Amino acid sequence: MREIVHLQAGQCGNQIGAKFWEVISDEHGIDPTGTYHGDSDLQLERINVYYNEATGGKYVPRAVLVDLEPGTMDSVRSGPFGQIFRPDNFVFGQSGAGNNWAKGHYTEGAELVDSVLDVVRKEAESCDCLQGFQLTHSLGGGTGSGMGTLLISKIREEYPDRIMNTFSVVPSPKVSDTVVEPYNATLSVHQLVENTDETYCIDNEALYDICFRTLKLTTPTYGDLNHLVSATMSGVTACLRFPGQLNADLRKLAVNMVPFPRLHFFMPGFAPLTSRGSQQYRALTVPELTQQMFDAKNMMAACDPRHGRYLTVAAVFRGRMSMKEVDEQMLNVQNKNSSYFVEWIPNNVKTAVCDIPPRGLKMSATFIGNSTAIQELFKRISEQFTAMFRRKAFLHWYTGEGMDEMEFTEAESNMNDLVSEYQQYQDATAEEEGEFEEEAEEEVA
């Protein structure tokens, strides 16, 4: 079996990670003690991707939980599925990172990272054929962003040919915890561009808007935001966890989704959007699901896909439905909106169908888009970064941990390069492509 080792780092990473395990354990018929009570062979067919089978037929998540302070992990341990995790896989410090990327990446986090890697190694060794790693973390804090990216680069060193996939929560001024979020996020993106194969950008601003506008929640809590995140994570991993043909492992997904190595930041979406209480009241049709799934209001990243073009798209439909209808609807969307898909990648929309719907829904659709509009998100962070960095505000917290201003400047320019790369491919047309080649050849000559 092709196994995935899951890591969760920092407060946010552990909270959405714990929620992810609750949701997928439920989908696979596994109770909080790790015992299987399911009703379908499909639930067990690829259970080994995320779970180890321990003695006595118990299923244990292949998960490593990391934090620089014990608080969040205590609440995971005392939460509904806290007892399902392997006790040795909780690795935590006592000092905390104080929302400081440098502490997570260079000082406090660097002291803890070896003990985390020991646990990761142990998990990787119990795998039959490891396909890769997935990390849940946020980019705004200290541990998830600083130590999370440190873990990624260390794992990359040790397992260079394995896929590295992250679910990264991007900070937003609307749901802000700390004033230095733009610094932490920019330093993290600098790392993610180089060291991950696939990054799902989950954006607090978009989650907030969905709760507020679509779900009509006047005061959304983190619980409500995390409900959306876990629905999305369950959807994008459905292909990996249940038998199917398309994008059935992380590498195949990357091959379909990433046309240029640096442009691997995906915009996830989900349909139907329901609040935590009200799932079961109406069944959607395939056309409605498709319509909703491509709607800007359903995107989990606060970017408007109409401001850019899709390089590639993967869609996962879940539930019992007609494949023919799904294919027709997906073609329909592409034909009607052809200007929003780059014409120099033919067949750039792939669709998978998985028979088992998420709990409480007859059918659902998850959307993964590699759109040039994601540059809006990086621009937003970059502007906030520049505003503070110009005045060197709060910089002493970072230089005090041994960082150099140079690293900030590099991170800033790497992020701006990323934005212009997205812009370049947004403007490119099939005809021009040849001209680029010729110009390049002339320069060489």
Swiss-Prot record:
<dbReference type="GO" id="GO:0000278">
    <property type="term" value="P:mitotic cell cycle"/>
</dbReference>
<feature type="binding site">
    <location>
        <position position="142"/>
    </location>
    <ligand>
        <name>GTP</name>
    </ligand>
</feature>
<feature type="binding site">
    <location>
        <position position="11"/>
    </location>
    <ligand>
        <name>GTP</name>
    </ligand>
</feature>
<dbReference type="InterPro" id="IPR023123">
    <property type="entry name" value="Tubulin_C"/>
</dbReference>
<feature type="binding site">
    <location>
        <position position="138"/>
    </location>
    <ligand>
        <name>GTP</name>
    </ligand>
</feature>
<comment type="subunit">
    <text>Dimer of alpha and beta chains. A typical microtubule is a hollow water-filled tube with an outer diameter of 25 nm and an inner diameter of 15 nM. Alpha-beta heterodimers associate head-to-tail to form protofilaments running lengthwise along the microtubule wall with the beta-tubulin subunit facing the microtubule plus end conferring a structural polarity. Microtubules usually have 13 protofilaments but different protofilament numbers can be found in some organisms and specialized cells. Component of sperm flagellar doublet microtubules.</text>
</comment>
<feature type="modified residue" description="5-glutamyl polyglutamate">
    <location>
        <position position="438"/>
    </location>
</feature>
<feature type="binding site">
    <location>
        <position position="226"/>
    </location>
    <ligand>
        <name>GTP</name>
    </ligand>
</feature>
<feature type="short sequence motif" description="MREI motif">
    <location>
        <begin position="1"/>
        <end position="4"/>
    </location>
</feature>
<feature type="binding site">
    <location>
        <position position="143"/>
    </location>
    <ligand>
        <name>GTP</name>
    </ligand>
</feature>
<dbReference type="InterPro" id="IPR008280">
    <property type="entry name" value="Tub_FtsZ_C"/>
</dbReference>
<dbReference type="InterPro" id="IPR037103">
    <property type="entry name" value="Tubulin/FtsZ-like_C"/>
</dbReference>
<dbReference type="InterPro" id="IPR036525">
    <property type="entry name" value="Tubulin/FtsZ_GTPase_sf"/>
</dbReference>
<feature type="region of interest" description="Disordered">
    <location>
        <begin position="426"/>
        <end position="445"/>
    </location>
</feature>
<dbReference type="GO" id="GO:0046872">
    <property type="term" value="F:metal ion binding"/>
</dbReference>
<dbReference type="GO" id="GO:0003924">
    <property type="term" value="F:GTPase activity"/>
</dbReference>
<dbReference type="GO" id="GO:0000226">
    <property type="term" value="P:microtubule cytoskeleton organization"/>
</dbReference>
<comment type="function">
    <text>Tubulin is the major constituent of microtubules, a cylinder consisting of laterally associated linear protofilaments composed of alpha- and beta-tubulin heterodimers. Microtubules grow by the addition of GTP-tubulin dimers to the microtubule end, where a stabilizing cap forms. Below the cap, tubulin dimers are in GDP-bound state, owing to GTPase activity of alpha-tubulin.</text>
</comment>
<keyword id="KW-0963">Cytoplasm</keyword>
<dbReference type="GO" id="GO:0005879">
    <property type="term" value="C:axonemal microtubule"/>
</dbReference>
<keyword id="KW-0282">Flagellum</keyword>
<keyword id="KW-0007">Acetylation</keyword>
<dbReference type="InterPro" id="IPR017975">
    <property type="entry name" value="Tubulin_CS"/>
</dbReference>
<protein>
    <recommendedName>
        <fullName>Tubulin beta-4B chain</fullName>
    </recommendedName>
</protein>
<keyword id="KW-0460">Magnesium</keyword>
<dbReference type="Pfam" id="PF00091">
    <property type="entry name" value="Tubulin"/>
</dbReference>
<keyword id="KW-0342">GTP-binding</keyword>
<comment type="similarity">
    <text>Belongs to the tubulin family.</text>
</comment>
<keyword id="KW-0206">Cytoskeleton</keyword>
<keyword id="KW-0597">Phosphoprotein</keyword>
<keyword id="KW-1017">Isopeptide bond</keyword>
<feature type="modified residue" description="Phosphoserine; by CDK1">
    <location>
        <position position="172"/>
    </location>
</feature>
<keyword id="KW-0969">Cilium</keyword>
<feature type="compositionally biased region" description="Acidic residues">
    <location>
        <begin position="429"/>
        <end position="445"/>
    </location>
</feature>
<feature type="modified residue" description="Phosphothreonine">
    <location>
        <position position="55"/>
    </location>
</feature>
<dbReference type="InterPro" id="IPR018316">
    <property type="entry name" value="Tubulin/FtsZ_2-layer-sand-dom"/>
</dbReference>
<dbReference type="InterPro" id="IPR013838">
    <property type="entry name" value="Beta-tubulin_BS"/>
</dbReference>
<feature type="binding site">
    <location>
        <position position="204"/>
    </location>
    <ligand>
        <name>GTP</name>
    </ligand>
</feature>
<dbReference type="GO" id="GO:0036126">
    <property type="term" value="C:sperm flagellum"/>
</dbReference>
<dbReference type="GO" id="GO:0030317">
    <property type="term" value="P:flagellated sperm motility"/>
</dbReference>
<dbReference type="GO" id="GO:0005200">
    <property type="term" value="F:structural constituent of cytoskeleton"/>
</dbReference>
<dbReference type="GO" id="GO:0005525">
    <property type="term" value="F:GTP binding"/>
</dbReference>
